[in-house]
Amino acid sequence: MTLNVVKGKFMWAKLTKKEQLTEDLWKMWLKPEEKFDFKPGQYCTIGSGGIERAYSIASSPDEDQIELFIELVPPPDGNLTPLLNELNVGDTVTMRLRAKGIFVLKPE
């Protein structure tokens, strides 16, 4: 499936690692094609097959990859996680350019 990424809104992110933790829970690491700035506590929005969902970022802002914990939610409630579960290292997803969320760690 070819998807045109809207400039200024989305970018591609490549799956660089995937670690299955349980039957329905895994970690995945994404390498965005552009620098992705975020604060601890924010989330990113990723997509595949025209479906988008928000996921809390588990990695540090100092890392060059985005680490996510994903729980499989089967259809009909889960539309994106079954697609993400089928991804292999090297596959790409869309990612919104900006992190969101106001529940961030405040400096002391």
What are these regions (language model features)?
Residues 1, 7, 97-99, 107:
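Short secondary-structure boundary segments
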Residues 2-91:
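Ferredoxin-reductase
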Residues 51-58, 100-108:
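Short, Lys/Arg- and Gly-enriched loop/turn segments at beta-strand edges
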